[in-house]
Amino acid sequence: MSTKKHNLLANFASSDSRFTQQELPACKPILTPKWVILTFLVSGVVFIPLGVICLFASQGVIEIVDRYDTDCIPLSSRDNKVRYIQGLEDKRCNRTITVTKTMKNPVYVYYQLENYYQNHRRYVKSRQDGQLRSPKDEHETKSCAPEDTLGGQPIVPCGLVAWSLFNDTYDFTRNNQKLPVNKKDISWKSDRESKFGKNVFPKNFQKGSLIGGKSLDQDIPLSEQEDLIVWMRTAALPTFRKLYGKIDTDLQAGDTIKVLLQNNYNTYSFNGKKKLVLSTTSWLGGRNDFLGIAYLTVGSICLFLAVSFSVLYLAKPRQLGDPSYLSWNRSAGGGR
């Protein structure tokens, strides 16, 4: 026997195993009516309590939402909001918020934007992550057009995402006493440590003829510019919230919070909405009833199917593997 044939037979023998021939022991359960009913029953018993727990946690979150984009435009300028927001008029606006239930600290301050598509492909691609991490890559601005360079020098951070940084501001007072907003650690720690360099500083940012949003302090590294870090984590949906800061004191029921805000950010060009949100959190996060409702819905459907199949099984039992149900054993009149 030649060496070639010997090797061929050896390879064939080595591949002729229970694994390659798919002969390993396996569990192949048969979906009998009892197993189907039991599966739906267990699923319903598990999902419904989970839904109640999640919904209860969500309902425990206290949230105050105040839409201000329209109310902070003077009546005389509401016919042309874009011209007002792009003008030089004073954009200060006073708002009053009443706390309906006691809010334990920390109270999170968010800004909410609607009809704002941060997931647009051209918008998302208009950034340079390498430039954010290292000063060696500050000239890598090819993907940032049109906000890539100014007078032949690179813009740091470049791109439309950074250029459109949210620039409304909020100042809170209660009983004529200022409520400080803590803006430390509002961004992800992993972003601060790995995505934004400690030796990368803003350059030529918001210095062009068109100003998109907030300016950055050129003496503070990007790793400490937490408003920017929060903004650069783009949202997947057109309605989103981003963390503005934290109030590290309790807000009592009945408290009146006065807000002095600067209505600078232009959402009027695309019919967007702006809202100020004060919220507590639970072990599950912020207020979101969807998860609890989803669990309750799926659990209820599973219980309904379990009961329905049980009734059908008891009313019209059918022997498993009955050959009389085979097509060739049925009568010519349509069978059973």
Swiss-Prot record:
Database matches in Pfam families: CDC50 (PF03381)
Main location: membrane
Ranges of Basic and acidic residues composition bias in the record: 127-142
Compartments, record wording: Membrane
Disulphide bond pairs: none
Chain segments carrying region Disordered: 127-148
Taxonomy, superkingdom: Eukaryota
Gene Ontology cellular component list: membrane; nucleus
InterPro entries named in the record: CDC50/LEM3_fam
Chain positions carrying an annotated carbohydrate: 94, 167, 329
TM helices/strands, residue ranges: 36-56, 290-310
Keywords noted in UniProt: Glycoprotein, Membrane, Transmembrane, Transmembrane helix
Tissue: Expressed in flowers. May be restricted to pollen grains.
Membrane topology: Multi-pass membrane protein
Family of the protein in this entry: Belongs to the CDC50/LEM3 family.
PANTHER family assigned: ALA-INTERACTING SUBUNIT 4-RELATED, CELL CYCLE CONTROL PROTEIN 50
Protein name, UniProt field: Putative ALA-interacting subunit 4
Organism: Arabidopsis thaliana (Mouse-ear cress)
